A protein has these predicted regions:
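Charge-dense, helix-prone N-terminal extensions
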Residues: 1-132, 180
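Glycine/tyrosine- and acidic-biased, solvent-exposed loop/turn segments at the edges of beta-strands
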Residues: 119-190
């Protein structure tokens, strides 16, 4: 699969030069802010994902460029900051010839990441928590509102830090602690 950036380079070439450059700079800045976000193509648009969740889509139109932060409530959270932009429930329009401002882009995408994190834990099923760079902080399963089954905890750089099992919310069996290079540092029995 081609990277989003190469797709974006090709995709945004269909627009006038300044418009394509503004879109490309915006998506590259989002990738810089969230280096662990996965590149994807969704609805025919360059997209950044965090796990199975969409962080943001990027697209150009005849009279504006748009960010689609994958949640209508993001626009509501930043009503004051977005007052100079045309905003609808699912999109934020910005000028054809200027990239979206980095400080505001960061605020919007961090808010979206917080929404993704807040969608967990579930009483039953998968739990995932993400760092602000888009990398996984921890992942496991819940059963009847308690941690149950295999769990993994990661460092900010994405390397595994600890893994083991929970049974009814209690650590169980062998837990392994890893050095940043992946080497096993110790094992603990519960």
């Amino acid at each position: 699969m081609a990277s989003t950036t190469s797709f974006a380079d090709t995709h945004f070439k269909k627009y006038p030069k300044e418009q394509g450059a503004a879109l490309l700079k915006t998506i590259k800045e989002a990738e810089r802010l969230f280096p662990k976000a996965e590149r994807a193509i969704s609805y025919g648009m360059p997209t950044l994902k965090i796990g199975d969740d969409y962080l943001c889509h990027f697209e150009g139109f005849k009279k504006h460029n748009s960010l689609f932060p994958s949640s209508g409530s993001i626009s509501e959270l930043f009503e004051k900051e977005l007052s100079m932009y045309e905003v609808s429930k699912g999109t934020i329009h910005f000028p054809l010839d200027k990239p979206f401002p980095t400080p505001l882009l960061k605020k919007l995408l961090l808010a979206r990441l917080n929404q993704i994190n807040e969608s967990y834990p579930k009483k039953n099923g998968t739990y995932i928590q993400y760092y602000k760079n888009g990398g996984i902080q921890s992942e496991g399963k819940y059963k009847a509102g308690t941690m149950n089954g295999a769990w993994k905890f990661y460092r900010l750089d994405g390397s595994i830090m600890r893994s083991g099992f929970f049974k009814n919310g209690q650590q169980s069996g062998t837990w392994t602690t890893y050095a940043a290079n992946g080497r096993v540092v110790k094992t603990t029995e519960f």
